[in-house]
Amino acid sequence: WENKEVVTPLGVAEERVLVSQPVVATILRAGLPLHMGMLRMFDKAENAFVSAFRKHHKNGRFDIQVEYSSSPSIQDKVLIMSDPMLATGSSMVLTYKELIRKGVPAHTHIVSVIASIQGVEYLKKHLLNERFTLWLGAVDDELTAQAYIVPGLGDAGDLAFGSKL
């Protein structure tokens, strides 16, 4: 940030403005609506995308699978990672680890609409030595056996785009 004189049609104001644009990253597909909202604020930002999804097993458990990523260098840049739901925190941590293959950010902001206590604790544990700030709309107390936040809002990707085939 730097102080800069901003001229408007009605006057001049001294304001703090970004020195450089952040990289706005999201987890495909559920994160796209929140990502688009972030781009309304940071309309000159670079974009990063990672596909991280739950691969379910017959025993009811699941692993987080990362199959695709596209990112500019994030070396010494501000990274803003957005995903509407922070349930277990696993996909956010794996996404972060995938992105830092393109450099280490100066600072990371993690933005979620709803998080679980378990997800927040998981981030704190697994991103212990990283510089990050959490921005959360709400923190709910419970995860179901299927790792959905209660009361939460359901599957954010399905709500935005319809059920998966």
PLM region descriptions:
Residues W1-L165:
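PRPP-associated nucleotide enzymes
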